């Protein structure tokens, strides 16, 4: 197995598998004799899978908490529902190494541009005032993960020593040692934390897909922060384009410059004090997993039948 960009020029692989990047599948389908698309966002109401996708199979994650609308897979060649992909072993590893009491994951922040720089700064201001400062005042061991360059530039300087840089494996290792992971509502991180057995708390969403993810999991009992209580819950139920949803959410984020509390101190405290869900409850949300094995089996069967 090699990354597409690392293959010798002019080579065609027996198969190309693109994971969580169905848009790029249209570009790389010519890189291999066969193309398999693994998607985690087929459930999004506003984002049916891209038209013009020619693939040997479209494997979409369908989790109990996020069922996929039938219209989102209509017209896609060979759609196959699979369980959650990837993540660590279901049980957290036993380790004597000390980790941080709290891991704060700020992945998903968009790189600042003239249009959104102040939105990013306002969002991080909310997190700093309501979560990071109180944790630090209590002396809680804390790590902040995400785009380290962006965070170093946009977070207040007093948090510079808490920012961690590393790859996904290093982030997962940090989470495995933490008592609680407080994270942006990204699906991959939520799934991995629930598989691992982490206690988890959800930060307020930054975009429409995060809002929809957050609403589903908050309704199921995971603790988290909503923008100004329930006032955005209606938006999660609307069938609208992502850019319009982002524009609405950005207005709520910018309003925090006047009213930065967003939620009660008790609600923020709930993130820090979150308890891990039982395996039974986690399975009711994300299923038993095994999506990566389903992908491997499909490739094995396809190539066995054709040989």
PLM regions with names:
Residues 5-8, 148-191:
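Donor nucleotide-activated moiety binding/catalytic core segment of transferases
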Residues 199-262:
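Nucleotide-sugar donor-binding patch of glycosyltransferase catalytic domains
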Residues 89-148:
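Conserved catalytic-core segment of nucleotide-activated headgroup transferases in glycan assembly
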Residues 1-69:
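Active-site and donor-binding regions of nucleotide-sugar-utilizing enzymes
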Residues 54-114:
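A nucleotide-sugar donor-handling region in carbohydrate enzymes
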Residues 6, 39-45, 64-65, 163-169, ...:
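Short, acidic/turn-prone active-site loops that include or flank metal/cofactor-
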